[in-house]
Amino acid sequence: MIDQEAQDYFYRHIWQSNIHLFKYSGDNLVDEINALKPKLVIDAGCALNFFKGKIKNLVGYDPVFEEADFICGHFDAPFKPECADVILALGSINWGDHDDIAHMLIKVKSWLKPGGRLYMRGAPGGYKSDRG
């Protein structure tokens, strides 16, 4: 089980203050995505919705954080197939075992328009949950 207090501290204090250090996060990613002129950007597992107001036409969802546009998980998100030009999955699709991750990827990819882009970041070497 994920320690919500620890996760909240991480996203509000550690991650937010270091986001600029990652090539595909922060302002570098904002400029790259906005240059594509997307009609819809989905931030899958947006946490505090860092990119809201920075990336045009962005909608974020997260199962926990109230800053998200939708409070839901990958399988409950209200998106139709092939609706998004860009999807961000920056650390949100690396929880669970290989089957869980594969199912999440299949679901999220189904929202991507042909020729769309998926920006993804996961835990190097995988992540072991309490389920395996």
Named regions from a protein language model:
Residues 1-78, 99, 103, 117-132:
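Class I (Rossmann-like) S-adenosyl-L-methionine-dependent methyltransferase catalytic domain
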Residues 41, 59, 87, 108-111:
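Hydrophobic aliphatic residue packing
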Residues 76-87:
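A short acidic, Gly/Pro-enriched loop at the edge of an enzyme's catalytic core
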Residues 85-99:
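A short SAM/SAH-binding and catalytic strip from SAM-dependent methyltransferases
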Residues 102-114:
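A short glycine-rich, Lys/Arg-flanked "PGG" loop and its adjoining helix->strand segment in the class I
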